[in-house]
Amino acid sequence: MSDRQQVKNARGERIAIVAGLRTPFAKQATAFHGVSALDMGKMVVNELISRSELDPKLIEQLVYGQVVLMPAAPNIAREIVLGTGMNVSTDAYSVTRACATSFQSAVNVAESIMTGNVEIGIAGGADSSSVLPITVSKKLAHALVDLNKARTLGQKFAIMRRLGLKDLMPVPPAVAEYSTGLSMGQTAEQMAKTYGISRADQDALAHRSHTLATETWNSGNLRDEVMTAHVAPYKQFIDRDNNIRENSVLESYAKLRPAFDRKHGSVTAANSTPLTDGASAIILMSEGRAKALGYQPIGYIKSYAFTAIDVWQDMLMGPSYATPLALKRAGMELEDLTLIEMHEAFAAQTLANMQMFGSKKFAAEKLGRNRAIGDIDMSKFNVLGGSLAYGHPFAATGTRLITQVCRELKRRGGGTGLATACAAGGLGAAMIVEVE
């Protein structure tokens, strides 16, 4: 049985990435303060359809994701369909796979096209760290249910007397891994210590990311893949990511204190991604349908892979597990790639994965390979800057990476590119695209 993955429909047509778009990414409580993930999702999907001059009635499926879920609109995908002029009968459902969420939504639509169930679909994701599901304590929640059942005033007073002042305080969403209680930042600290990643190297990678992102924006290369967002009450707009340090100075990074291990740590706010708001989306079609409608795709999906590892130690190693599987399914080696886009959740996590790509020991012990994945050529790696600069709205990052690598390959005359990410829960995702 061949290990090659056939990302094609029954007619042998490839899955085309026709277009991609995102909102600018904004730090928490700044430009998108008060704007929900749903509103950002509708915003970007509407604009993507408009720019592509695609009849919304032709869209047969929308798969959209969110990580910080809002109880008021648990199926964000369906709400986007209802708010963007698509047929009310358009198939729509929501997914969540932590930071790999929009990789998952893209693959789900691709697989629907591969099976012949649909010909045209939209995938993406959105998250807001500024509009959060603030909840109540477990004790108060229990009491509220009991109050609803209580019949007499005396019963209600008895229930209320069980509560202390701290039980009445609002509870923000947890930032820790449910299974371990560790935050992503604490995991990044773990990885820095396990793999001997220095503070200087972390700061240098962050500086590189901000410098390249600034150059990319100033060159105009992101103009066609980032929309201008007008935010209610429509007295202002945002047309550029606002986390990028446009005058990044490497020496200034050393001034920050460690954020997660104050005494012995090396992970700081400057070499980590901030909490971010934003949304992204891509249009996928069968190759034949794209051609019939007159589109010139920005790329095609060649292979993809998802993996999972234990969460207790160094769980953000997803790229080191998912990438070799995606390469194998594409019949490729790392050196065959033209570009590599790796999600930079933390500089420590990124550098640890880069180190393990080149490790024969890791390949033999963890992957069962007789050779390393390969040393990363920095002239191919995150050439436009990465998440450390752009920011990281959890569910939006995957389709941001896919669009960005496809469009950069297009500018370079074609080739193959890798988009890969780690994710909470020990998850990993990788996708290889080809561009003509």
From Swiss-Prot:
GO CC aspect terms: cytosol
E.C. code: 2.3.1.16
Annotated catalysed reactions: an acyl-CoA + acetyl-CoA = a 3-oxoacyl-CoA + CoA
GO biological process: fatty acid beta-oxidation
Keywords carried by this UniProt record: Acyltransferase, Cytoplasm, Fatty acid metabolism, Lipid degradation, Lipid metabolism, Transferase
Matching InterPro entries: Ac-CoA_C-AcTrfase_FadI (IPR012806), Thiolase (IPR002155), Thiolase-like (IPR016039), Thiolase_AS (IPR020610), Thiolase_C (IPR020617), Thiolase_CS (IPR020613), Thiolase_N (IPR020616)
Subcellular location: Cytoplasm
GO molecular function annotations of the record: acetyl-CoA C-acyltransferase activity
Pfam family, one: Thiolase_N
Assembly notes: Heterotetramer of two alpha chains (FadJ) and two beta chains (FadI).
Protein known as: 3-ketoacyl-CoA thiolase
Source taxonomy: Bacteria, Pseudomonadati, Pseudomonadota, Gammaproteobacteria, Alteromonadales
Name of the encoding gene: fadI
